[in-house]
Curated annotation (Swiss-Prot):
GO biological process, one term: cell-cell adhesion
Naturally occurring in which organism (per UniProt): Homo sapiens (Human)
The protein's assembly and partners: Interacts with CPNE3; this interaction may mediate the binding of CPNE3 with ERBB2. Interacts with the NPXY motif of tyrosine-phosphorylated IGF1R and INSR in vitro via the PID domain. Once activated, binds to GRB2. Interacts with tyrosine-phosphorylated CD3T and DDR2. Interacts with the N-terminal region of SH2B2. Interacts with phosphorylated LRP1 and IRS4. Interacts with INPP5D/SHIP1 and INPPL1/SHIP2. Interacts with TRIM31. Interacts with PTPN6/SHP (tyrosine phosphorylated). Identified in a complex containing FGFR4, NCAM1, CDH2, PLCG1, FRS2, SRC, SHC1, GAP43 and CTT.
SUPFAM superfamilies: PH domain-like, SH2 domain
Gene for this chain: SHC1
Annotated spans, CH1: 340-487
Protein name: SHC-transforming protein 1
Amino acid sequence: MDLLPPKPKYNPLRNESLSSLEEGASGSTPPEELPSPSASSLGPILPPLPGDDSPTTLCSFFPRMSNLRLANPAGGRPGSKGEPGRAADDGEGIVGAAMPDSGPLPLLQDMNKLSGGGGRRTRVEGGQLGGEEWTRHGSFVNKPTRGWLHPNDKVMGPGVSYLVRYMGCVEVLQSMRALDFNTRTQVTREAISLVCEAVPGAKGATRRRKPCSRPLSSILGRSNLKFAGMPITLTVSTSSLNLMAADCKQIIANHHMQSISFASGGDPDTAEYVAYVAKDPVNQRACHILECPEGLAQDVISTIGQAFELRFKQYLRNPPKLVTPHDRMAGFDGSAWDEEEEEPPDHQYYNDFPGKEPPLGGVVDMRLREGAAPGAARPTAPNAQTPSHLGATLPVGQPVGGDPEVRKQMPPPPPCPGRELFDDPSYVNVQNLDKARQAVGGAGPPNPAINGSAPRDLFDMKPFEDALRVPPPPQSVSMAEQLRGEPWFHGKLSRREAEALLQLNGDFLVRESTTTPGQYVLTGLQSGQPKHLLLVDPEGVVRTKDHRFESVSHLISYHMDNHLPIISAGSELCLQQPVERKL
């Protein structure tokens, strides 16, 4: 009787999947050293390219991975029919960056989990971690086989700029965390299609779009086409995605990395588009669409992936520690205190410590002390995890690098009786104030108007640390006397009275808060909308998010003389015409 030839021993260069013929002929189980990835979390496994045993090759890791779904980009590798551009399973801290040889536009997903280190740790079965992409948590960013396009120093510093067209944005009504990965991809592609139909001259406008499915119609809201079709300069860095008009240098949007929750390329008919979901005070949660020149969209996606990988690695090198009441506010960048909002129950905060819930207790403010909370200090990516953090208020063209040593040691302010800072509920940093009160002894009755905000969206990772009741330090008499000599200082003035004095864009004035003695507010008109910015932080320092000033007069003259806008929470305020007080 003829015997079947023995089944060859498992070769790691072969596809792990056995054909039905081999299974029937074998009758034996694979060797014990064969990895057994979860069938529910692994898609078709691609063999590594022959001769390419670099540890950064994405495919070489797949036999060791679980909880990872692979799907090919549109028109991807033959023999598989995966979702276009998908490189990671939902809920895992993985970013799929651009792969030059795998189709037009791979995806980036769950990027805020990289920026914050949130989400479940990727499970690795068999073998040890290897390669630069691998972190101690088993997460990685699959860089292109040719490597990243730009030097790390450039991405961590001033950023990489691309000339693209901004096509507008579409409101996203649900948190991306509540959606599965397929739906997230459909949301971004549907948003691209909606914008292509609405904007004349869009590359994808000629194709026939299928009607929006019912689930997507409940997720996508109104479109904002205010700047649609405008050529812009997109600057990608570990700090943010900055969108600036190419002609007038107006900043259209500045989305901090921790506010970006999902990014994707278009389908084969809209391959030159990049879309990402982010939150900002103007559009709330929205999907922003960019039209790239031919062949550039993949480079944009790859650069965004590089920025998130660097940001995540810096986070892992300097993870936040369990802070104590004395250093809990170290690294505070002022993004919560410097702007007034009209509706206090719906404040949105940017958290510079992604993935970390605000600790309770403690009223001593040590945020600017050198050496305090070294684990909570920013690693190296500007704005969220970098020692060179300068916030979002950098002038156009100014490098974002810096040295944390420039932060001077500031002692905590001495206790001061009387009114406490931020009693006015119109200030942006009063959210969670009652939680802090209860944690330190229940000082004051709870205020439902302040503490009744909607549940936070953990996926967007923007809950700011609970505000502290820090009494303001005594203001020097010289500052008050100096302001009285300034023509744009109007003394104590309410918000409504101040807004009534503004007529043209660029008009501004400075007023003293009617509720908090010693606090000064800059009121200006930008794009027809009044803005109110606090000028004195809880420690009594006159500052914006990137500079500290000797006085309010110094701050005003600095921005007026240099024609620099003050940027706060993604919007800017230009100081052009001072509104002089009437004698």
